[in-house]
Swiss-Prot record:
This is Glutamyl-tRNA(Gln) amidotransferase subunit E. It catalyses: L-glutamyl-tRNA(Gln) + L-glutamine + ATP + H2O = L-glutaminyl-tRNA(Gln) + L-glutamate + ADP + phosphate + H(+). Belongs to the GatB/GatE family. GatE subfamily. NCBIfam families: gatE_arch, PRK04028.1. PANTHER family: GLUTAMYL-TRNA GLN AMIDOTRANSFERASE SUBUNIT B MITOCHONDRIAL AND PROKARYOTIC PET112-RELATED, GLUTAMYL-TRNA(GLN) AMIDOTRANSFERASE SUBUNIT E. Gene3D superfamilies: 1.10.10.410, GAD-like domain, GatB domain, N-terminal subdomain. Keywords: ATP-binding, Ligase, Nucleotide-binding, Protein biosynthesis. The lineage of its organism: Archaea, Methanobacteriati, Methanobacteriota, Stenosarchaea group, Methanomicrobia. Heterodimer of GatD and GatE.
Amino acid sequence: MEKYDYSELGLKAGLEIHQQLDSKEKLFCRCPTLIRDVKESDFEFFRYLRATESEMGEKDRAAVEQTKIRRKYIYKAYDTTCLIENDEEPPRELNKEALDISLGIAKLFNMKPVDQMHVMRKIVVDGSNTSGFQRTAFLASDGFIETSQGLCGIDSLCVEEEAAQKIEEIGDSIIYSLDRLGIPLVEIATAPDIKSPRHAREVAEQIGMFLRSTGKVKRGLGTIRQDVNVSIAEGARVEIKGVQALDLIEDIIRREVERQLNLLFIRQELIERKAFVCEEIYDITGLFVDTKSKVLQKGVKKGAVLAAHLKKFEGLVGKEVQPGRRLGTEFSDRAKTAGVGGIFHTDELPNYGITEKEVKTVRDAIGASAGDAVIMVADEPEKARLAIEAVIQRAKEAMEGIPEETRKALPDGNTAYMRPLPGAARMYPETDVPQIEISQEYFDSIEIPELLTERAKRFVSENGLNQELAEKIAYSKHLPLFEELIETYGKDENVNSTLIARTLVGIVPEIRRNGVETENLTDEHFKGLFVAISNQEIAKEAIQDLLAALAEEPELSTPEAISNLGLSAFDPEEVENFIKKTVREREDFIKEKGPAALGPLMGIVMKEYRGTVDGKILSQMLKKELDSFINQG
């Protein structure tokens, strides 16, 4: 049961899906799209970035805020990256393979391509691009998908280069890895047609299925990201970036709606109280020269303790806007953009070693009355000043309602401030890459891939898989291998489609749960396994042990692993003699049980030959010997 009536609240929501493409080379250079261990980096360099003007002479507001603090950006490079990632060389022509994949995706979403594609520069000064901008190209628009709530529009599809991966922050320095920078990706933006949190998840799942249906997108953590745009009738558009898991989408939207409703309540309360934000910044460093508070002692040593006076704000700074997050947390997020650790406010004091007497002294010093709130920041003078200015600005916005922001998704479903929403000044033309013609003939030549849902149906009808197994293999990363193997063993009595599918999506996960690194298994390992089963060199019961052995020692070939495990081909005469001996030694038991003795006897035989002889063969041989004994008796 949903907490809110989203239709009544006027919820508008849309998604932006960023999906890496599985091309051999990067978008604007010929480097491979390999993700490297940062320890393999063979050199590094650093940059300082600043906001630049667009072709209209304007600076993007988000870029301006992000460059208020001078940060040092350190880049880790590899023998698989080049001067283009370093921004020391102009880009090459756009990757044709990536363009073909992107056009195929556009077709799946019923989109119309542009006649002429122009590459643009999108200003990004968070350090994730060495150049200070990301190259992006608008490719298609005006598409749709069908959902349980009606059609959901697909407004745009852009081809972009992936950003560098943030490794860590050390003080005012941020370290990035260049292995990811420049990997091709598509950005797919829906229309604001999403009607509820559950509908958002449905749309995201369907878009993800369409993308995986191409067989040409990367898989795994970090290869797909969802941004969510949310607003309600009296609220504002907020872009929430970096939703990694589908499970989080519903919570993100629910909690953003809750945040906006609580902020609207706070606004109304402030209006009724006739609240006011004082512009003056108060230097109260001298009041804490002898403080026992360790956090304030550090601030005094750094140089400044500054304060802001918010009239009639008392009790509201500490009001919860999302579970575990308050209006004061929103103030703190803004302050942190200046490089400080956070803020103190009187709704949570005395605390942190700050005494009631010290709070009263501060109130008296700046003229704060009962019912007023005081915000304090302790840090280096310039950082503290920028931080307190940011808090004053956010407090003013609290009186107006909800600011338009870009926020980051947190693991618990809450969100935190990142920067203002970017404006039109963020984009300007890329002059180093020529325009690309997209003719109707070219677009028509792009094949539409079969959807995974359709493949699953085909696996049921043509290959005899049950529905659950068909869906698992269709959505598995092993899908291409499965299709290759069923083509090879289509008429093989020993290797059928069900055995192949169960091995890939049933046995492999079971081995992984036992702590075995199944990522070490290659397609060649699986192919060798099924060759051995087809030739009756091993039994089906040996699959799990053999795959576990190959995963632990991936340098072994399948025949070598079979030999090491003692799973060599069986001698039919030896097996027949063992079965006869087993039957003779249990004559009384067989006379008592008759044909029902087959099960217990099978357990004895399987214990001897499990993994060496196929259970079906053992069962047939034992039944034949048992029937012969009973008939003679």
